[in-house]
C-alpha cells in the first residue's frame, strides 16, 4: 500500500540541542524507574553523577584532593571539589558571542574540555554536566579562584539569577551577557561548588 502523506523537507525536524535533550532524555540519563516522586529518582541520580564525574576527573588528574557530595533532606544536592574550578575568563564561542568559561562548560551542550585530547574516563565525554544543567529547573554554580567567588545560576541551561536562594520556582532574571559572572571576595580555597536546590527535576 502506498502512503498518502507527502514527504518533503518540511517533514524533517531540526531541533536545537536543548530541544533534542528534552525529547530524548532517556538516551542521556536512562529510563525512569521506581517512585517518580522520590527526590533522587534514577534519572536525577544519573544526572548528578555526571557533575560528580567532572569533579572526580580533577582529582584523578592531580589537580585536587577532595570531592564532597552532600544530599540534603529537602531534596537538594551539592557537589564540591578542590580542583581548579571551571575557567572564569571569557572567550568567543562558535556563534561569535563572548561567553565565560562557566557558560561554555555548562550552557553549551556541544562543548567540553575533554575534546582537546586531554580527557579522562568519567562522564559523557565532556557533555554530561551541560546536559544535566539543561534538564534542571535550577542549578547554582560557584567557582573559587584567586581569592574570589564567581557565581551564576541557570534555569534550563539559561544563565541568570534567581530572586531568592534555594527555591527553583523563584523569579528568574535571564542574563543577556553570557560573559557575566557575579564576583565577590572570598578567601576559600580554589575549587568549584554546584548546587541542585530542592525540587530540582529532570524535565
Regions found by a protein language model. Give the residues of each.
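Bergerat-fold GHKL ATPase/HATPase_c domain
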Residues: 1-49, 92, 100-107
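GHKL-type ATPase core
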Residues: 2-11, 75-101, 112-203
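Structural motif corresponding to the C-terminal cap of alpha-helices
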Residues: 25, 29-33, 55-59, 109-116
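Compositionally biased, low-complexity repeat tracts
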Residues: 33, 71, 79-81
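Short beta-strand/loop element within the Bergerat-fold HATPase_c
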Residues: 66-74
Amino acid at each position: 500500500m502506498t502512503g498518502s502523506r507527502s514527504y518533503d523537507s518540511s517533514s524533517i525536524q531540526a531541533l536545537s540541542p536543548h530541544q533534542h535533550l528534552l525529547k530524548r532524555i532517556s538516551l542521556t540519563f536512562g529510563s525512569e524507574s521506581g517512585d517518580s516522586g522520590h527526590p533522587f529518582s534514577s534519572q536525577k541520580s544519573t544526572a548528578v553523577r555526571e557533575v560528580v564525574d567532572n569533579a572526580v576527573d580533577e582529582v584523578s588528574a592531580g589537580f585536587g584532593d577532595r570531592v564532597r557530595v552532600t544530599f540534603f533532606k529537602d531534596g537538594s544536592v551539592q557537589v564540591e571539589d578542590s580542583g581548579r574550578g571551571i575557567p572564569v575568563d571569557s572567550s568567543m564561542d562558535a556563534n561569535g558571542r563572548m561567553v565565560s568559561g562557566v557558560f561554555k562548560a555548562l550552557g553549551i551542550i556541544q562543548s567540553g574540555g575533554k575534546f582537546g585530547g586531554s580527557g579522562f574516563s568519567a562522564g559523557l565525554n565532556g557533555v554530561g554536566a551541560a546536559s544535566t544543567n539543561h534538564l534542571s529547573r535550577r542549578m547554582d554554580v560557584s567557582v573559587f579562584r584567586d581569592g574570589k567567588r564567581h557565581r551564576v545560576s541557570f534555569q534550563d541551561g539559561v544563565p541568570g539569577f534567581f530572586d531568592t536562594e534555594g527555591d527553583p520556582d523563584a523569579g528568574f532574571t535571564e542574563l543577556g551577557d553570557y560573559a557575566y559572572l557575579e564576583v565577590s571576595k572570598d578567601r576559600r580555597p580554589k575549587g568549584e561548588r554546584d548546587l541542585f536546590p530542592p525540587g530540582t527535576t529532570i524535565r
